[in-house]
Amino acid sequence: MSGRVGDLSPKQEEALAKFRENVQDVLPTLPNPDDYFLLRWLRARSFDLQKSEAMLRKHVEFRKQKDIDKIISWQPPEVIQQYLSGGRCGYDLDGCPVWYDIIGPLDAKGLLFSASKQDLLRTKMRDCELLLQECIQQTTKLGKKIETITMIYDCEGLGLKHLWKPAVEAYGEFLTMFEENYPETLKRLFVVKAPKLFPVAYNLIKPFLSEDTRRKIMVLGANWKEVLLKHISPDQLPVEYGGTMTDPDGNPKCKSKINYGGDIPKQYYVRDQVKQQYEHTVQVSRGSSHQVEYEILFPGCVLRWQFMSEGSDVGFGIFLKTKMGERQRAGEMTEVLPNQRYNSHMVPEDGTLTCSEPGIYVLRFDNTYSFIHAKKVSFTVEVLLPDKAAEEKMNQQGADTPK
């Protein structure tokens, strides 16, 4: 039994009745607490009454704290409205709304420098509520229950800039909020035009996703347009994605419905850095350097780093060792990222590097040019691994099955 209205086992029927009784005190505060709504929370917690009740009560608190009932009338700041990519466009064959996330042109760093994380998260909450409102309207229009959405993730242009740690952490907060407060609303998620970096990016966000959500993700191959047309009618799919829908002015991307983002002009910036915690702090003596080694076992891994110095600049470069087991000078190693001086005492530095071959990579903080001052450097370095299942999926031509 699926645990949905009209397909409940006697045990599930009993659980639903008991659940309604247990949470009857909070039901009047919720927009539409019908059986469909209550079953979403039960399915999300495998019909465990205690866990389902705890989840729903936490959601009621969330709605109160974030003033969710009035969120649709709230207007996000101008920079978010103009540059946060994505949008709702059309319906799938069952009448469920379709939401597009456009990853490539998203300027994550620019958004976090121009808007507060709270406003960005609030905008995503507002999007969720607008989608639920659209489901209610579709239910009335079609005369059948619509309670889920289809998502299309356009990953063309996904790059190292999108792996910036504060951006990934902010996106993780949104995914956690979505999982905790909008359970069982995702019907399926299509990933299209995924580049080689996708398995690394997916591995970063996977911990924030429930098993159920992961099963609904379909990474599509070269035939992605054909696959989308099996789920969405051509007149409901933009020309850009293989359908026939255009804007009134003929634009094939349907830009009146989908925001395609873009680089944010610096005049919007309200800060030039995001506060970060660092895992290590070292003192680099005058006239010397400090090396940190990381073993990379296979190609495609990504090194991600952030660092800051105190009082003065510091040199930084990345090298690949040519001999194992012994410390090597910079000149004896293969230079991967050229050494240069960074004003990291003024603005913290961050970066990423895709490792094209296995070996021992050395991140070197250079103070050899300073004969007077030692440098205090705080840093965090991580090795980001690709998700193997996603990688295998992408290696299969036209992979289009849930992982």
Swiss-Prot record:
Pfam family, one: CRAL_TRIO_N
Gene Ontology, cellular component aspect: cytosol; nucleoplasm
Superkingdom to which the source organism belongs: Eukaryota
Residue stretches making up the GOLD domain: 275-383
GO molecular function, one term: lipid binding
Description of how the protein assembles with itself and partners: Monomer.
Protein name, entry field: SEC14-like protein 2
Gene responsible for this protein: Sec14l2
